[in-house]
């Protein structure tokens, strides 16, 4: 045990040195250089060293600044006006809504169209054209899982960024009910950079609580999102219910007030199971929890009718409940940034990206692009 801790400390210390002393990086073999966490900050290294590997950040540490005023950042149609009290609620709690974007019967039609569309291969990330590599090749489904590792990886990519090959989905995120409310929080200019479908099958487990800001978790080495100021609000996520989302069928949950700062993960052991009875995540023999004290009264289930959406900051601890029903729950989310935010590094765009959490690597981003959904892009940082 002591030897393992010493080796871990030594490995992290050497990694830190190589990241800080940049001229040494030119001497490293490419294979080793590609494994270095070049995006880690001093605080990230010191946290894992001081805790001897028991605490680790999986996103860049930051603290959300409160604005000098809670007035809307731009004027909008009065039908979509947010009050100062609502904007203050968002900053204090990390979410706002739900709001209606389309009628339930319209949402049902959109869902049917999109479910049919998802049966086709993505033209943005076509697996048949080697647009990415699935690391997990097993197709067997274990007793306590809905899908095999292979299917989980494939579906995660096939459900990603379909707004780029489906105009009906893109139009949903251009709806003024969504854009006008986001503009009051972010500013008049908005870019959609990522969408993802979130179907939850009958009996499917919930998603453990987690945080995100710059999406360093994608590859655990470098962020995906580069805003001018990490501590400002620079991104919003809109989660749209295509079917009713209830506590019974696996609605989202947000822990209010946890948007104030990004926290490290706590890693403890030993454990033998993959899933605990308290909803925390286990990897092998390690138990993973976010290092934030969660009070049960702060865990807010976000129940919605089909055709409603809510806006939240992924800095907030968020996840979803298990689907205890016999019906599927369908939803789609979109991540929206200001145009002064850079997305993906030049290396990621040229050589490919990784999505570790679903076991995918070498993602070709040639067909990916941002979409201006409101205002103008005065920076031109992104393709």
Locations of regions flagged by a protein language model:
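Non-heme Fe(II)-dependent double-stranded beta-helix
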Residues: 2-92, 99-221, 359
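Short, conserved beta-strand element in jelly-roll/cupin
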Residues: 185, 218-247, 303-306, 311, ...
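Short, well-ordered beta-to-alpha junction loops that form the rim of enzyme active sites
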Residues: 195-197, 202, 241, 257, ...
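Short, structured patches in soluble enzyme cores that scaffold and shape functional sites
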Residues: 196, 211-213, 236-244, 256
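A short secondary-structure junction signal
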Residues: 204-211, 218-221, 248-257, 263-267, ...
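Double-stranded beta-helix
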Residues: 232-235, 245-317
């Amino acid at each position: 045990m002591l030897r393992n801790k010493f080796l871990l400390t030594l490995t992290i210390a050497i990694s830190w040195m190589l990241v800080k002393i940049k001229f040494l990086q030119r001497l490293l073999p490419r294979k080793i250089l590609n494994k270095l966490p070049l995006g880690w900050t001093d605080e990230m290294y010191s946290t894992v060293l001081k805790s001897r590997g028991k605490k680790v950040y999986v996103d860049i540490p930051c603290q959300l600044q409160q604005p000098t005023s809670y007035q809307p950042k731009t004027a909008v149609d009065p039908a979509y006006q947010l009050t100062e009290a609502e904007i203050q609620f968002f900053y204090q709690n990390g979410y706002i809504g739900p709001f209606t974007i389309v009628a339930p019967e319209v949402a049902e039609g959109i869902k049917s169209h999109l479910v049919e569309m998802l049966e086709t291969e993505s033209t943005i990330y076509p697996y048949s054209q080697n647009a990415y590599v699935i690391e997990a090749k097993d197709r067997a489904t274990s007793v306590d899982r809905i899908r095999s590792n292979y299917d989980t990886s494939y579906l995660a990519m096939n459900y990603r960024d379909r707004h780029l090959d489906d105009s009906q989905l893109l139009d949903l995120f251009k709806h003024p009910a969504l854009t006008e409310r986001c503009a009051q929080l972010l500013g008049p200019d908005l870019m959609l950079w990522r969408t993802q479908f979130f179907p939850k099958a009958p009996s499917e487990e919930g998603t453990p609580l987690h945080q995100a800001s710059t999406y360093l978790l994608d590859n655990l080495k470098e962020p995906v999102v580069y805003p001018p100021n990490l501590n400002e609000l620079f991104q919003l996520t809109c989660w749209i219910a295509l079917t009713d989302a209830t506590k019974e069928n696996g609605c989202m949950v947000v822990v209010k007030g946890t948007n104030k700062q990004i926290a490290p993960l706590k890693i403890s052991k030993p454990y033998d199971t993959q899933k605990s009875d308290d909803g925390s995540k286990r990897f092998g023999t390690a138990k993973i929890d976010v290092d934030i004290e969660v009070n049960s009264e702060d865990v807010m289930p976000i129940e919605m009718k089909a055709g409603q959406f809510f806006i939240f900051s992924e800095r907030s601890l968020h996840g979803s409940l298990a689907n205890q029903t016999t019906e599927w729950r369908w939803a789609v989310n979109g991540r929206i940034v200001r145009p002064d935010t850079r997305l993906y590094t030049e290396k990621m765009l040229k050589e490919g990206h990784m999505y570790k959490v679903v076991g995918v690597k070498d993602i070709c981003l040639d067909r990916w692009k941002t979409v201006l959904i409101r205002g103008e892009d005065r920076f031109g940082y992104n393709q």
